[in-house]
Amino acid sequence: MLEDLIKEFKEIFKYDGEVETFFSPGRVNLIGEHTDYNGGFVFPCALDFGTYAVVKKREDKVFRMYSKNFKNLGTIEFNLDNLVYNKKDNWANYPKGVVKTFLDENYKIDSGFDVLFYGNIPNGAGLSSSASIEVLTAVILKDLFKLDVDMVEMVKMCQVAENKFIGVNSGIMDQFAVGMGKKDHAILLDCNTLKFEYVPVKLKNMSIVIANTNKKRGLADSKYNERRSSCEEAVKVLNDNGINIKYLGELTVAEFDKVKHFITDEEQLKRATHAVSENERAKVAVEFLKKDDIAEFGRLMNQSHISLRDDYEVTGVELDSLVEAAWEEEGTVGSRMTGAGFGGCTVSIVENDHVENFIKNVGKKYKEKTGLRATFYIANIGDGARRYVK
């Protein structure tokens, strides 16, 4: 595949010399959903599919970007001296925002580059195609311009690019998982301190199955930002009543139960209840995983989905239909929505002997209920973003 991408790069950019190649994964979060911007714990892993780039540094200040995923948009061109968000640049605003953020942080980037991107992460699936291209761009910049910057710093800058340049208030989880991923491990990340731990994911006779609802959705215009402000309002209410916290993630369920009566707005209370309980669930689930108790880990995945459905209200009929069909299947250890919600994907742990039936039966029930056709992927846990050497 890489040879084909290099060949296509050379045709599009009329160039026949040496090129650089890079890869950046997608990610899936196993548990700990909508906790990242609440200063809590998440448990994502990088996937073995993602975004590839073929790159050639230029002598001038021009960037020319082409994506095989958006061929109809052709080559998108912009200049180092004019890095502003432009709606018609569409997907290229993501890499552009990363370049701008590096410059704002005083990293020396003195020329542009030509790049061909190709991603095999389904767009809008909630598997972080945007974080993947952001971190990929950061790795390209570091390599081409020999920048002295570590991955955690790059991850933070990519989050800034998404928040400030694109205008989506995402937490740090996506970029962190994409940049810091490690084969066969998930990352227990404290989003408040960025302390993290690699935890081996040893599923023995089971697999991680990702199911895509194939429902069209956009993160920026979804109700994501509303959920976030609900939680911030709840924190404000608690602070006004003498509970001194910056994030809901600082409270255990027991501590929250003692003070939740201060939150009189019913919707805020539900949102805060999810943030606190999900954070505790994530920590407990990882302890079970370390003890090889996959059954308990799966049970907590199920509870996570119920909380996201009832308290956080970010699931919707498509995700619920997929998860409920999964729960009915023999061999399902756990199943929940993953990512921001309102469409996107579910993640399930399924016994290998039952995977084939799982895909067939869940797909059939989902189509009967929603009229949509789900796409299924068996996920392998891969490494983070890097220069790609065959």
Predicted features along the sequence, with ranges:
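FabD-like malonyl-/acyl-CoA
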Residues: A131-S132, C345-I349
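Gly/Ser-rich oxyanion-binding loop with an adjacent helix/lid
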Residues: M1-F22, V28-G32, G40-F41, N79-L80, ...
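N-terminal cofactor/phosphate-binding cores enriched in small/glycine residues
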Residues: G32-H34, A46-L47
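Glycine-rich phosphate-binding loop
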Residues: F342
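C-terminal nucleotide
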Residues: M1-R27, Y52-K88, H185-G334, I349-K390
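Short Gly/aromatic-enriched secondary-structure transition segments
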Residues: G39-A46, R227-R228
